[in-house]
Regions:
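Fungal secretory targeting signals
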Residues: 1-19
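A domain-level signal for the mature, folded cores of soluble proteins
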Residues: 17-126, 139-260
Length: 260
């Protein structure tokens, strides 16, 4: 089944609103690079939360949920595509005659709970990475317990050209991303791999809030044990720590060049 971004999906599922269910921000794609054919698509196993919006349209931080009770209690809104975003940031660097880009796509979850007895933490940020050379995806990465793991795209089953990532419970521990298996069927209520509405770092805006104001809030908010992997204080380090072999070192100038 073809992958769809959130804005193109029929909103056929509903759920009761809760205090942490912020309506999603409007789509805000980057203007300095075209990601429409390369963004990842996601599924979410039934043993974990569905994604939420980490920041509200009015700039409020999501308060998250305490990791108690049911592992999935209070964090599986059926209409989650109305209530979540994919936070994107990228950098591109020319080396010789080639252009290399690294893209991070981060999702927020209300909690990351290990067992019904507790364990884990309020808030979770997990992300996927897409690495391109001359606009062609060469590698994809998934986050797991504070690290990023890359796989050559030739080894991955595509979803109409988009790499497929699954958010799952990692054994007896907490939750993480992983690559989808060949032929894996989506478990989320929409019945297909999806991408919550993308908001890119230098394009996202709130209701009456500028891009700079929203970025400043995301840079400042404390999500406890969870970390946004593309903030100003860590994005360049993360890019260079996890760039695939053969990719040049990204620079501060390459981050600046991603601004519109």
């Amino acid at each position: 089944m073809k992958a769809f971004a959130a804005l193109t999906l029929p909103l056929i599922l509903v759920s009761a609103a809760r205090g942490d269910d912020f309506p999603r921000l409007e789509e805000a794609l980057p203007r300095t690079v075209d990601i429409r054919s390369t963004y990842p698509v996601f599924d979410f196993d039934t043993d974990g939360c569905l994604p939420s919006a980490g920041i509200a349209r009015d700039g409020r931080q999501n308060s998250g949920l305490k990791p108690t009770g049911s592992i999935t209690g209070g964090c599986r809104a059926g209409n989650f595509l109305d209530l979540s975003n994919t936070l994107h940031r990228h950098a591109c660097l020319r080396s010789g005659t080639d252009t290399y880009c690294g893209h991070f796509y981060a999702l927020y979850f209300l909690k990351d709970q290990a067992t019904v007895l507790g364990g884990g933490h309020r808030h979770d940020w997990e992300h996927a990475a897409v690495w391109t050379k001359n606009g062609v995806v060469t590698h994809a990465g998934y986050s797991a317990h504070g690290k990023l793991y890359n796989v050559e795209v030739a080894q991955l089953p595509p979803q109409y050209g988009h790499v497929k990532i699954v958010y799952h419970k990692d054994g007896v521990t907490t939750h993480a991303m992983r690559m989808a298996k060949a032929g894996e069927v989506a478990e989320n209520g929409y019945g297909q791999f999806v991408t919550p509405t993308i908001i890119s770092w230098y394009e996202l805006r709130g209701d009456g809030l500028t891009n700079e104001q929203m970025r400043n809030k995301l840079n400042a908010y404390d999500y406890g044990s969870a970390t946004i992997p593309l903030r100003d204080n860590n994005f360049l380090t993360n890019l260079n720590t996890y760039r695939p072999a053969g990719y040049p070192e990204f620079t501060a100038a390459s981050l600046e060049a991603s601004k519109p």
